Amino acid sequence: MKKFKYILLLAVLFALGACQRSQEERMAVLKVYNWADYIDEDVLAEFPEWYKEQTGEDIEVIYQTFDINEVMRTKIERGHEDFDVVCPSEYIIERMMRKDMLLPINREFGETPDYIPNLAPYIQDELNKMSQGDKQVTDYAVAYMWGTAGILYNTELVTEEEALECANLWNKKFSNKVLMKDSYRDCYGLAIIYANKDRIEKGEV
């Protein structure tokens, strides 16, 4: 069963609180929170120069990474740190919108054209299914990339038939030989699919 996961780029509503930087200093900083290895280091290094060409202003980029969606959301929700741009999966965006944790995207920036309307209608429709009330998701998030959760296996040790059978993840033959992605959603999803395998095969769910 294929599961598509969108990674989205969005603006985060942050509470300044007792921050150490003045508001003016904070405006000269772009804080990005993303998955590891998603943006080339050369892009991060070149961004300040591009930004100055667009606006005439200097900018400092602070780039932090996370490996679990829930860790990212908790860090922001509890006000441990503020970010301007974060890149969570789509279900986290839906939860953040419910709690008014997001700011609309500024579409008028420097000399850069607004390419957001060129996004495929299908993708825009899919994103907007998560909209809350009169708030359209596409005003707060942009599709960044997508991925498919799957299973990797060593063909010298596992046959194709074994790899296609979800139950083999619990097979004693593979005990202590299986590694799983550290993702609550993927782990729960796999367990639920396995528990309802018969109903799925019968088309009941």
Model-derived regions, located:
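Early extracytoplasmic/lumenal segment of secretory-pathway proteins
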Residues: 22-99
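Extracytoplasmic ligand-binding site segments that recognize negatively charged/polar headgroups
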Residues: 38-41, 91-205
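Sec-dependent signal peptide recognition
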Residues: 2-9
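N-terminal hydrophobic targeting signals that begin at the initiator methionine
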Residues: 1-2, 20
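C-terminal motif of bacterial Sec signal peptides marking the signal peptidase cleavage site
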Residues: 15-18
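Intrinsically disordered low-complexity regions specifically enriched for long asparagine
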Residues: 20-25, 202-204
